[in-house]
Design a protein with these regions (language model features):
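An acidic/histidine-cluster motif and surrounding catalytic segment
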Residues: 1-131, 139-170
Length: 170
C-alpha cells in the first residue's frame, strides 16, 4: 500500500497539536481499514493532500464549479461498475501503477481547518474527525456515493462500522 501524503496547510501544526498521533498514521490506518472492510484484493495507492480552506475552495471551484470551502474532496481514478466490485480488474492494466502493480485509487483532499472546526462542532476528537473524513473519502474512491437515501444509508453504515472497528468512536 502506498499513500503519498502532502501537507500544504498553514494550520498543520495546530492540527498536529490536537491529534494523538501524526496525521499520516491516522490516514494510513483508516485507508487500510477501509480496504480490508471492502475486501479489496489488491495492493493500492492513493494520494492525500492536507490543505487549508482557501486551497480546498479553489480546488472545489476548479473541479466541481462550487465556490465554497469543504471538509474533504475525493477524486476517484477508477470507475466501478458497482461499489467495491473489483471483478474484471485483472485485465484492466491501465488501472495499475506499472512499476509497483498497485491499483491507483485516486486523490483525497482534506481541509485542516474543517477537521478542527467540525471536531469541535460535533463534540469529538480531531483524531475521530480525520478518521471519519478519510473513511468517507476512501468509500468515494471505491465507488460509493450518497446522492440517494439508500446510498447514503449504506455509506453511513459502512463509515460507522469501519470507524468502530478501528476504535474511533464518537
Amino acid at each position: 500500500m502506498t499513500v503519498n501524503i502532502e501537507n500544504e496547510s498553514e494550520n498543520l501544526q495546530k492540527l498536529r497539536e490536537k491529534l494523538s498521533k501524526e496525521p499520516g498514521e491516522i490516514i494510513n490506518e483508516i485507508i487500510l481499514a477501509v480496504l480490508d472492510h471492502e475486501n479489496c484484493p489488491y495492493e493500492c495507492a492513493a494520494d492525500v493532500l492536507i490543505t487549508d480552506d482557501d486551497m480546498i475552495r479553489q480546488i472545489n471551484k476548479e473541479q466541481r464549479d462550487i465556490d465554497k470551502a469543504t471538509d474533504v474532496l475525493s477524486f476517484p481514478m477508477v470507475d466501478f461498475a458497482s461499489p467495491s466490485d473489483f471483478e474484471g480488474f485483472d485485465d484492466r492494466y491501465e488501472l495499475f501503477e506499472p512499476d509497483s502493480g498497485e491499483l491507483l485509487l485516486g486523490d483525497i483532499v482534506l481541509s485542516a481547518e474543517h477537521i478542527m472546526a467540525q471536531a469541535e462542532e460535533y463534540g469529538h476528537s480531531c483524531d475521530r474527525e480525520l478518521a471519519f473524513l478519510t473513511a468517507h473519502s476512501m468509500l468515494h474512491l471505491l465507488g460509493y456515493d450518497h446522492m440517494e437515501d439508500e446510498e447514503r444509508e449504506t455509506m453511513e453504515q459502512k463509515q460507522r462500522d469501519i470507524l468502530d472497528e478501528a476504535g474511533y468512536h464518537r
